[in-house]
């Protein structure tokens, strides 16, 4: 392994990336556009999100910051519960979020990939290492990240 050879190793653990044309936004936008957006299940599951611009910055830093090594959480500094994420996305898109999606809903509505991503999303992760090193996030909260990605700033 690289670490045995004395090389610096950074293991970037990436959260749910918020990108206008990919990931969960690509899957959720049509539902919200049709007025079918809503919290998933209980809505209490955590979402450790990261804006696309920020994830690019973090990978760049992982490559070039010689002081950074080991596991690094590439997530935004403020994880949110699914209920809050849903409310923010609805507000940014100017669409209602009235219909809660039952627990089997993600597989039916979002397919295997979407259901898998959302099932893995129930984690409250903090970017402690980055924050302790003074990393500056472009988007500190999910509302700002979603507004930026969806061109609603």
Predicted regions and their residues:
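NAD(P)-dependent short-chain dehydrogenase/reductase
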Residues: 2-11, 15-46, 52
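A secondary-structure boundary/capping signal
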Residues: 12-14, 76, 126
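Residue-level signal for the nucleotide or nucleotide-sugar donor/cofactor binding architecture
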Residues: 19, 47-53, 80, 125, ...
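Alpha-helical membrane-targeting segments
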Residues: 27-49, 91-122
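Alpha-helical substrate-binding/gating segment
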Residues: 29-37, 45-79
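Mid/C-terminal beta-alpha module of Rossmann-like enzyme folds, strongest
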Residues: 58, 65-113, 147-153
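C-terminal amphipathic/interface module of NAD(P)-dependent oxidoreductases
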Residues: 117-153
């Amino acid at each position: 392994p690289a670490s045995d050879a004395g090389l610096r190793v950074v293991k970037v653990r990436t959260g749910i990336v918020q990108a206008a044309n990919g990931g969960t936004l690509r899957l959720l936008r049509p539902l919200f556009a049709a007025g079918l957006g809503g919290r998933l299940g209980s809505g209490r599951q955590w979402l450790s999100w990261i804006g696309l611009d920020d994830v690019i910055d973090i990978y760049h830093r992982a490559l070039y910051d010689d002081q950074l090594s080991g596991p690094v959480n590439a997530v935004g500094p403020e994880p949110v519960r699914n209920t809050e994420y849903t409310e923010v996305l609805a507000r940014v898109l100017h669409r209602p979020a009235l219909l809660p999606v039952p627990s089997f809903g993600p597989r039916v509505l979002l397919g295997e990939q979407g259901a898998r991503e959302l099932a893995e999303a129930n984690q409250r992760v903090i970017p402690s290492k980055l924050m302790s090193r003074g990393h500056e996030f472009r988007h500190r909260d999910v509302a700002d990240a979603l507004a930026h990605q969806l061109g609603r700033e």
